[in-house]
Amino acid sequence: GADESLLDTYQAERSPHVRRIVESAVGFGRIICTLDVDEAAGRDQTMIAAREANPVDIGGAPMPSLSGSNLVTDGAGYVVGDSRIEGRILDELLDGRWAVIGREDSLTDDDRRVLSGLDAVVIDDDGDIVIVRPDRIVFGTGRTALEALADVANRYSLAG
């Protein structure tokens, strides 16, 4: 199994993430739950005007990324989006495992050894390499992420 020090990364990684989510929820709560009638009317007018000025649906609230551990690389740490690859739902392809999405022919023999040791799934797709953790968090992208994954697999004895 994995080295027990892997568990030490959990608090460092999740605490800032949860803090940002709670702060965001409190901020939205202040906007939504005002008891002042005049303040609520002003808020409503501002939001209606903003929606009319820019009617494009921007989706849900942004989700903060994970940070604070070596289990994500710079610019990563977000939950991978729901999508389809070759007509299949990405969750079905990920199957709760490490995954590499991208051009399979860009992987080196060393990459393949690391991925095999992790029992990672390789999803051949056009575009840059994206590495997804078993918890659906983007570990990183590109060649540097593949190298970082090899380091993490070694450091925490993740390879079988």
Residue ranges and their predicted role:
Residues 2-160:
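Helical substrate-recognition/capping region of FAD-dependent monooxygenase/halogenase enzymes
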